[in-house]
Every structure is written in C-alpha cells, then in structure tokens.
C-alpha cells in the first residue's frame, strides 16, 4: 500500500509495460486516483471505508488473484485480493484499526461482500508459499481456477495448498454469514 497518486500509478504502469501496451493497442490507463468513502450496508465489522473509484464505477468486476499464503490471514486469494480496492496509504490505516486476525478477516469479508465481483480467476501456475504477501518462495503448482464466487474459489485454493478452509478465518466468517461454502 504505497501512495495512490497519479505519478505513482504512471510509474507502476510504465514499469510493468502497460504504458507501451496501451499505446500499441489503443486503450487508456486510469491514473486519476480518485476514491470515495462508502458505506457497506451489510457489514459486520467495518461499516465505512474508502474505495478507489474504478471499483465503484464499473459494469463488471473481474478479481484476478495469485494463489499464495499470507503471514497475517494465512491465505491470500480472491477475497484478500479485493483489499487492493482500498487506496494506497489507507491500507495500513485499516491494519491499525483491525490489528487482530479475526477483526481484519471480518473486514475483508465486509469489503468482498460489498464489491461483489462478477468473476474471480486465481493464478496458481506459479504460486507462493511462506510469509506472504512479499516474503514467500515461488512454488510451481500449474493450476488456474475460476468461479463466480470468491469464497468458493478460495476454498478450492486453500485445499490445493493443504490448508483446511475452516482454518482460514475469512472463509469461516464468509461461511457463517451464508456467503460461501
């Protein structure tokens, strides 16, 4: 969660090769970096937070995530990936507001339920295990998964890496709310 500024976004797009790709293929990249404070009507833990505008002004939301373990919540897949909708430096703020694993996991489910992705795709071709999100080791898995349900996809993902889905607090929370398997 670094700064959510036009300069930062342009540098990221340039570094990833997206600027050249956009020029070649004739599409635009969003660099305005606007966000809005939103109310999450069905939330149990976090009723208000900021969300980047592209997540709010959309026709369709595809959640493209990597299969990986995570130091705080145990697993990072489709549900955790949507934390990317929270603008840059507001992410550490939410970590401070919800420092316990249970509370943070509940906030992630609140956000996922609000954003309601239309399609989730999990890239597990080269997964990551260890102390994620950045401290893990690459692991060749050779799998790709997709689902309309971020919760169902994450249950499959946890099973693939040998975790019991009920041991992942956000998946247990989603199940208790009737959102996932």
Regions found by a protein language model. Name each.
Residues 1-181:
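N-terminal and secondary-structure boundary signal
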